[in-house]
A protein has these predicted regions:
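Surface-exposed peri-terminal alpha-helical interaction modules
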Residues: 3-145
Length: 145
């Protein structure tokens, strides 16, 4: 795969978060590590309590600066040939008429009535369905999209 030059996206943050580690993992197409890094950066955005517990409350996500969410999303889009990112997930969710069950099936988080198990049953490369990752909004029922 063609690696895009690092820093082809301005890494903007309203909360002085450094997105370079995420950019590097995505540039290497190490999507599993990038997914974990995405959650880590989102916990940093939420503050020290979230960093300690390593997951997010729905209410914390509501207060995220749009600048940071756009930076994370743009990095995912750019390094996945447009397949992965919050905006892709949102587009698919809207295309299902905001039906969560259809959405989860479409992006491969569920097969029939069975949830895809983390991490081994997820597909961590570009052969995954569109919108398959990042998983951050699956964890603890957090919806970023």
């Amino acid at each position: 795969p063609n690696q895009l030059p690092i820093h082809s996206v301005p890494l903007l943050s309203d909360r002085h978060i450094d997105y370079t580690p995420l950019e590097q993992l995505l540039a290497q197409q190490d999507f599993q590590a990038a997914d974990r890094m995405t959650l880590q950066k989102m916990c940093e955005l939420a503050g020290p309590d979230a960093v300690q517990r390593k997951w997010l409350y729905f209410t914390e996500v509501e207060n995220f600066p749009i600048t940071d969410l756009q930076t994370i999303n743009t990095l995912w889009l750019l390094h996945s040939e447009g397949k992965f990112g919050f905006s892709v997930q949102r587009e698919i969710w809207l295309s299902t008429g905001k039906n969560w069950d259809k959405f989860w099936l479409k992006i491969g988080w569920k097969t029939g009535n069975t949830w895809t198990r983390y991490p081994n049953e997820f597909t961590w490369d570009l052969s995954a369905p569109r919108g398959h990752i990042p998983l951050s909004n699956q964890l603890r029922g957090v919806r970023v999209i």
